Amino acid sequence: MYLTNFQRSLKLLGQLCSSPRDLIPYFRYSITNNSPLELELPWWSQSAIREIQKHLNHSHNVFEWGSGGSSVFLAKRCKELTTIEHHPDWFEQVERILKDKETSNSRLLLREINLEDEQAFLSSPYAQSLQSAYDIIVIDGEDHFGPESSWSARESCFYLAQEWISKDGGLIIVDDSWRYPALREKTKSKKMVIHESIGPCRKGVTSTDFHYY
């Protein structure tokens, strides 16, 4: 749901009042000029970041659509990470950071994407990159989303992810989940948790959903 600036401000105030521990991170992120990539943090809600820090360990194989600070963050904490990116310039930036951090357990792959329509997207190398089972799948990449859109690339990725996620404790993470209410109704997960809070380098409140299988 799209909010007015006034509604966003009220929601932010309510969130900070209900979760005082987010006050310090919020103001720290507000005064920094660093990006999530430079901070080595996912661009998720703060609540989701806290939760994945408790959940993730070095036995997990992770797949990620969309690269950035999350790629560095996850690579440091998992067994193996495969990340799919479609934007060449951004790919080079993230690749450079991953090499600097010596994350030898990560694979960053550049894959073409086609957003002409949903079928073209599903047939693109970007969508077809997921071809094996993973413990954790993160959906935080490119999208075809907006008030006039009839389909969403991230929703399509979610349905693909449900085919490949481990059914023995697997986890699918959907960022900016407020955009995709249909996924909360169509999930096949055993449990779903909505993490709504502030996030790194965000001016307002966002949500990141965890689907447990």
Q: Across the structure, where does each feature detected by a protein language model lie?
A:
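Membrane-proximal basic amphipathic "stem/tether" segments
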Residues: 1-43
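Glycine-rich phosphate-binding "P-loop"
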Residues: 26-42, 53-56, 136-137, 141-150
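Short, well-ordered alpha-helix to beta-strand connector turns
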Residues: 59, 78, 134, 189-190
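Generic enzyme active-site microenvironment
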Residues: 62, 83, 138, 173-174
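A short acidic, Gly/Pro-enriched loop at the edge of an enzyme's catalytic core
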Residues: 127-136
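C-terminal substrate-binding/active-site "lid" region of AdoMet-derived donor-dependent transferases
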Residues: 136, 142-213
